[in-house]
């Protein structure tokens, strides 16, 4: 049974009026992915769904990515095929519209898994991806306001990211992702602009295979939230291990988030999954995580936050 699920990031949506736009965005993405999935390719479905999310400035990936501490955009993305364990990823890339498509090219056109920074940008140009500025005025304004807020008072040094997020949940702008099963294989993909005010050069879980993105013959997972948590727990791979041990995608998602909460507390993580039986799963320990999914037999996607 074929299935696809997408997420638009875990965290706190401060402005309630944004929720309908977020729901519309994940619905649009899952429908675009479903269209490709019905043609038979989970790989095309995952890439297309994530491209739609990257192109929507309400999400923190591609256009509308958040800014680093020095006001720049550095994006991460990864994609992985469960049948062959082929994977491609980029980290700290800038000047491209769709990092997920560059990640796919890394998988298909090189012997490598991960390209970073200037090397990733050079590779993108060689592959024909044109120069593109993903910065939006809204993100620039948010960056200025947040930086001013943090600079007020007696703060003489930058606090650890985890402490900042507890005091200012809006820092956690999270990630987008998709996981699909086409009847033959599971594919997972994730893309992000990272965390607001992250240090230059910071890489989160998204492009780390096994941490934020993973797929094998039994399941696939895409994580969202505070990347350092997913890295330390190898959370995407761990979630698929739960499926190998007999859980379905939903139970495995819940088990993965319980693990994250146990070790690192609430407001840290969300996950989506699909297993090789066509089950979808999603769980979070944050206030919100936008998601939408389609399975065989459904006429319309189910979506929520």
Swiss-Prot record:
The active site is at residue 175. SUPFAM superfamilies: N-terminal nucleophile aminohydrolases (Ntn hydrolases) (SSF56235). InterPro entries: Ntn_hydrolases_N, Peptidase_T2. Autocleaved. Generates the alpha and beta subunits. The N-terminal residue of the beta subunit is thought to be responsible for the nucleophile hydrolase activity. Its EC number is 3.5.1.1. Keywords: Autocatalytic cleavage, Hydrolase, Protease. It catalyses: L-asparagine + H2O = L-aspartate + NH4(+). It holds the Pfam family Asparaginase_2. Substrate binds at residues 202-205, 224-227. GO terms for biological process: proteolysis. Displays activity at a broad temperature range and is highly thermostable. Optimum temperature is 80 degrees Celsius. Catalyzes the hydrolysis of L-asparagine into L-aspartate and ammonia. Does not exhibit glutaminase activity. Belongs to the Ntn-hydrolase family. L-asparaginase is an enzyme of therapeutic importance in the treatment of cancer, especially lymphomas and leukemia. It functions by reducing the availability of circulatory L-asparagine to tumor cells. This P.abyssi enzyme shows 78% to 55% growth inhibition of cultured human caco2 and HepG2 cells when subjected to an incubation time of 48 hours. PANTHER family: L-ASPARAGINASE, N(4)-(BETA-N-ACETYLGLUCOSAMINYL)-L-ASPARAGINASE. This is Plant-type L-asparaginase. It comes from Pyrococcus abyssi (strain GE5 / Orsay). The lineage of its organism: Archaea, Methanobacteriati, Methanobacteriota, Thermococci, Thermococcales.
């Amino acid at each position: 049974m074929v299935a696809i699920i997408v997420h638009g990031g875990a965290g706190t949506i401060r402005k309630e009026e944004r929720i309908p736009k977020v729901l519309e965005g994940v619905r649009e993405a899952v429908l675009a992915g479903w269209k490709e999935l019905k043609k038979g390719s989970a790989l095309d479905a995952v890439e297309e769904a994530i491209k739609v999310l990257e192109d929507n400035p309400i999400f923190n990936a591609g256009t509308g990515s958040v800014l680093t501490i020095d006001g720049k955009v550095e994006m991460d993305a990864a994609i992985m095929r469960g049948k062959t364990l082929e994977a491609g990823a980029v980290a700290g890339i800038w000047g491209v519209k769709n990092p997920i498509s560059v990640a796919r090219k890394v998988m298909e056109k090189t012997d490598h898994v991960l390209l970073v920074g200037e090397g990733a940008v050079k590779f993108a140009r060689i592959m024909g991806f044109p120069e593109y500025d993903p910065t939006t005025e809204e993100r620039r304004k948010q960056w200025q306001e947040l930086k001013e807020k943090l600079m007020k008072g007696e703060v003489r040094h930058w606090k650890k990211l985890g402490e900042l997020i507890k005091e200012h949940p809006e820092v956690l702008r999270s990630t987008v992702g998709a996981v699909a099963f086409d009847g033959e294989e599971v594919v997972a993909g994730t893309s992000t602009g990272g965390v607001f005010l992250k240090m230059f050069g910071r890489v989160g879980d998204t492009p780390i295979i096994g941490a934020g993105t993973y797929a094998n013959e039994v399941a696939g997972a895409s994580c969202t939230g505070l990347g350092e948590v997913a890295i330390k727990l190898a959370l995407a791979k761990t979630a698929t291990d739960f499926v190998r041990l007999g859980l379905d995608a939903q139970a495995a998602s819940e088990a993965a988030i319980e693990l994250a909460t146990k070790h690192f507390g609430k407001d840290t993580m969300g996950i989506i999954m699909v297993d090789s039986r066509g089950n979808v799963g999603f769980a979070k320990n944050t206030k919100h995580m936008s998601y939408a999914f389609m399975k065989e037999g459904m006429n319309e996607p189910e979506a929520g936050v």
